[in-house]
Amino acid sequence: MSHTADGPSLRTWWHDSGEINRATMVKPGNVRQSRKYRVQVSIAGANKFYDSFAYESIPRNGRGRIYSPWDAPDSNTGVANDGITVEISAGITMAWSQFEYATDVDVKILPHQGDMLPDPSKVKIRPTSIRYDIRPSSDGGIIIRVPPDSNGRKFSVEFDHDLYTYCSNGLEYVSSSDQNGHIVSVEPRNALLIFASPFLPNDMVPRIDAPDTKVMTPGPINKDDWGSSGVLYFPPGVYWMNSNQKGDTPRIGENHMKLHPKTYWVYLAPGAYVKGAIEYTTKANFYATGHGVLSGEHYVYQANPDTYYQGLKSDGRSLRMWGHYSLGGGQTWFCRGPTINAPPFNTMDFYGSDNITTRISDYKQVGAFFFQTDGPEMYPNSQIHDVFYHVNDDAIKTYHSNATLTRAIIWKCHNDPVIQMGWEPRDISDILLQDIQVIHTRYIKSEMDIVPSTIIGASPSQNGQFTTDLNKSINSFTIRNLVCEGICPALLRITPSQHYRNFVIENVAFPDGLQKHHVNTGRSMVPARNGVEFSVAIVNWTVGGHKVTMENFRADQLGQLDVDASYWGQWSIR
């Protein structure tokens, strides 16, 4: 019997329909529960612990590699290269637990099946730059003291006895015993993330009893059940898309919620778990708030609504977890609190107008094992802060001007850079990215064209047609306070498609060093482009605790920088 907290200082939640199952799809009305961990939370020092549900995500969501949502599990009808490599055979999982708090709390982590967790000296919390007090508990677990924080806390708890070593031969992951293999990352086999969130302000929680609110009932969601009210409210419980677009039932993974034009707000209450995706059609400002979960676990990779949700890739139409295809202009998307699990493609895109901006905070993305699972778009004048992105594509997409991102934690898989500013020539300015913690990366091979394996990157094009536009520039772009943990890939791999002016990278730390082996992912590269300016300043960059300077930056030295000689005198390291 679970025991949860529901007070002004602490709120936790639980699902009685938790299903421990790491091999197949869970029942539609169930939630996959961590088979490894139990999480409890107490007001600090009170020693009165309340249950906090530990969710779990697994690669391919137990469906296997399938093309159509009605295909038999593990029938291998889907594309061979979906971004998932050794994860299933290695038993990789990702668990998370979330709660709301307003004071110091103690988070207790217990093994699920009676084992003992290691003593605190064999526990690492990432980002490591933020220190936590860890002590053993008398019942075989550990207790982590989490201080109050108006921005919340997000961290990974990692145990020395449960790590997986990713090794690559430069083409693919290989066994650690392979003599041609080199370590590219060491990560948890069974990850555990803790999301300690501040309570939402009143203006981010709609009234459940308001006349313009549609309150959903936990269970199956059939065609048009979501109605036409202004607010769509999901109370605690489990929900799933149960019909196809024609209304036939049961049909799993064959529909999403295309909201009525009057509906502008989706609220996911703490404890709401919605298996589906959201498409807005409103011309007003629109919202997604609440500490519930929106999960794409029922969708196949690259699910395309235009082909009955089969996995036919379309950059424009494959399913987004948050989408809008008919913007009216002058709109803002307010997103505060949700967790996104198992996206089947890009997580968020809005179309129809360039006059769109976002305000995103306390946003979490987990279980992003498929390719194309990127971070949210940063539209013009966007402000994003206090986010956690698990991604297997571009994490931070900087395609528009006057955008700010602050306090981001990134767990990167093996596709595309962490920070992306390429694909086509751009004319943008006034970008600020600061306080970025990259806690894991695991690039398989050295790539420069299309999908550069690097922290800061600019892909030259999507179709192999490299274009340079000397009438455009990326100007006044600052990356500040960037930390990459573990053995890191290159700082930058940029194919210039336009000028770079007043581009500043400052206060960068790679405490565990750069990759140095023949896989060659540690080398930064900037090839020549005729007539392009490359005015870039790197300030206070350390690798393994040693400062990179103009005396030790070269490809065979500490910085491993290979910048074409044509740019000499335009860029600097100090």
Regions found by a protein language model. Give the residues of each.
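Extracellular "leader-to-stem" segments immediately downstream of a signal peptide or signal-anchor
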Residues: 1-254, 275, 293-314, 544-574
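Short, solvent-exposed secondary-structure boundary motifs
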Residues: 133-137, 244-250, 268-270, 337-338, ...
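Core residues of folded domains in eukaryotic genome-function proteins
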Residues: 153-155, 230, 262-264, 284, ...
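Residues in well-ordered beta-strands of folded domains
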Residues: 158, 235, 289, 322-323, ...
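Residues within well-ordered beta-strands of beta-sheet-rich folds
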Residues: 233-235, 265-269, 287-289, 334, ...
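Glycine-centered loop/turn motifs
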Residues: 236-237, 253, 263, 271, ...
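Beta-solenoid repeat scaffold
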Residues: 254-272, 278-294
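Glycine- and acidic/polar-rich repeat regions and solenoidal domains
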Residues: 276-279, 285, 294-332, 337-569
